[in-house]
Amino acid sequence: MNAFNPAHFRAQFPALADAGIYLDSAATALKPQAVIDASDQFYRLSAGNVHRSQFAAAQRLTERYEAARERVAAWLNAPSGKDIVWTRGTTEAINMVAQSYVRPRLQPGDEILVSEAEHHANLVPWLMVAGQTGARVVKLPLGADRLPDIASLSALITPRSRVLAIGQMSNVTGGCPDLAQAIRLAHAAGMVVMVDGAQGAVHFPADVQALDIDFYAFSGHKLYGPTGIGALYGKSELLAAMSPWLGGGKMIAEVSFDGFTPQPAPYGLEAGTPNVAGVIGLSAALEWLAQSDIGQAENWSRSLASLAEEALAKRPGFRSFRCQQSSLLAFEFDGIHHSDLVTLLAESGIALRAGQHCAQPLLAALGVSGTLRASFAPYNTQDDVAALVHAVDRALEILVD
């Protein structure tokens, strides 16, 4: 592992040459040259499919594919690569858990606790399952600190509570709840815990064994990897108890017109030809990330968010929704619609997001219809902060009467 060097880190992202001032890494991270090269090499030099053909090139590709599974397991400190299921991303992983593990075990009146801070991907699947089974979704509200109020969790848990769905890190505020305490309380009541790691994975790799996490999902594209690839971690006994969600090739051990026998997990949960290129690219991203001190990189990103927040706070009407000095800065200006402001910022070459960030209940709890969100990554610079502040000043001159 090398000490973090902002200039060296930034130099590895060719897209920055044409991305403007890129402050939208919470939506998707840019890709380093190492990931681009791995993906290019796969398409130029690889032959065959995984877990199917017997010729040498296909066998080598299968070995790389399974080595990537082991790399993800090591990154999460999972006991085994067999505890990792490939998915298209966090959304598919959560839906898989909801439909394959939770739905068959729910009865009418059972309860699914979901934090108010969740991305829609960790809320809508539970609303769907509740509608299918007669269970109900119970809200774990925000506290005064804009984090899920873990202190109120004990009072919400009842004998009918079955699942806790909670995010590792908010994609709006950047706030990180006390996962360890939430998991302890849920497990004491016999509940299963689904952790959405989509936003948090790149900032704080989760130790799934130390936290005693039941299910954990993340997406490659927010982790400097390709789009369309993600992973689900599940405790081995929980994955073994899941019935296949999709049927098709590769996931069966035996099939006839009388029925079929699925492969054991994780393979029985991975129907069809997988996204091999995505797996190779994700593995390359994790290998590349391991070369830098992630903690130092995170501190750099946080310092940029603090610098931006301090500068913008000097402008009249500024309001920040940032939590815990995170690298995400969600903000608004009184009397100015976020869509108007982000349009003018885009014209100035500032790439960030405005709107509800796929978190409508959270925005409602914050009392706003939408925010702007500048999400800082280790490849950003103090010059990027200065450009953002300058562009905001120019926009305010136009928008403020």
Segments (PLM) and residue ranges:
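Pyridoxal 5′-phosphate
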Residues: 1-401
